């Protein structure tokens, strides 16, 4: 009986050791942020939404699409509420493929408010190949698509850390405690002062992660 108990203790100890790496790779619950839009009576902060679009345009748009939104959505009530002229200028800053013309040829033209946001890649395959085999998710409805919503996205953006001792990562993989397995293929793209906000707000990592 004593030998059996000793064996049981040894097996239990070995089991605890084997489980330790798994426990260290568990996702951490997202940080809870006091969002202005929280609750039934919450409203979006117009200035924050405009800053968030600036972060998207200057940082995120090189990889992430917003294919379910049109440029005119930027001027709608409850959103960033850019003026009509601002929306036209934003849309016109993009070259949109259109056609065919009378000769059957495709052509490019300046964007219009009615156009969908231009995607950075022509298709899913191209986007996946350009990002190490990981498809950058579309950001149109990302908050609704992710468990934890805005808290989760914010946490991931501020959650990059050096891996703890004993944890090794493949090339092109980064440690982030808010991701499943604590691994993410998207590099840490935010750093203090990266964007010069049009309204003069200091662009800390925390601020940009909240705005976008």
Language model features: what each stretch is:
Residues 2-43:
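Post-cleavage N-terminal segment of exported redox proteins
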Residues 29-54, 65-79, 83-84, 200, ...:
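Electrostatic cytochrome c docking/interface patches
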Residues 30-40, 115-122, 129, 192-197:
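Short, contiguous pre-domain boundary segments
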Residues 50, 54, 58-61, 137, ...:
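Solvent-exposed, polar/charged alpha-helical surfaces in well-ordered, non-transmembrane soluble domains
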Residues 54-65, 118-124, 135-144:
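C-type cytochrome heme c attachment motif
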Residues 75-130:
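Structured domain cores in non-transmembrane regions
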Residues 134-171:
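Acidic, glycine-rich loop-and-strand cores that form catalytic or ligand-binding grooves
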Residues 178-180, 184-212:
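Extended, hydrophilic extramembrane loops/domains of integral membrane proteins
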């Amino acid at each position: 009986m004593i030998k059996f108990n000793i064996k049981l203790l040894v097996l239990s100890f070995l089991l605890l050791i084997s489980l330790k790496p798994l426990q260290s790779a568990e996702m951490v619950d997202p940080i809870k942020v006091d969002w202005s839009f929280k609750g039934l009576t919450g409203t979006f902060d117009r200035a924050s939404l405009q800053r968030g679009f600036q972060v998207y345009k200057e940082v995120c748009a090189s990889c992430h699409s917003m294919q379910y939104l049109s440029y005119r959505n930027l001027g709608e009530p409850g959103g960033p509420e850019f003026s009509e002229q601002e929306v036209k200028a934003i849309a016109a800053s993009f070259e949109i493929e259109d056609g065919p013309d009378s000769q059957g040829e495709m052509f490019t033209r300046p964007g219009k408010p009615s156009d969908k946001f231009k995607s950075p890649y022509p298709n899913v395959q191209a986007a996946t190949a350009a990002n190490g085999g990981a498809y950058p998710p579309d950001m149109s409805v990302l908050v609704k698509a992710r468990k934890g919503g805005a808290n989760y996205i914010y946490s991931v953006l501020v959650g990059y850390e050096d891996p703890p001792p004993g944890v090794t990562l493949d090339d092109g993989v980064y440690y982030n405690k808010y991701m499943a397995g604590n691994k993410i293929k998207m590099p840490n793209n935010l750093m203090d002062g990266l964007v010069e906000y049009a309204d003069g707000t200091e662009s800390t990592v925390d601020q940009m992660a909240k705005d976008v």
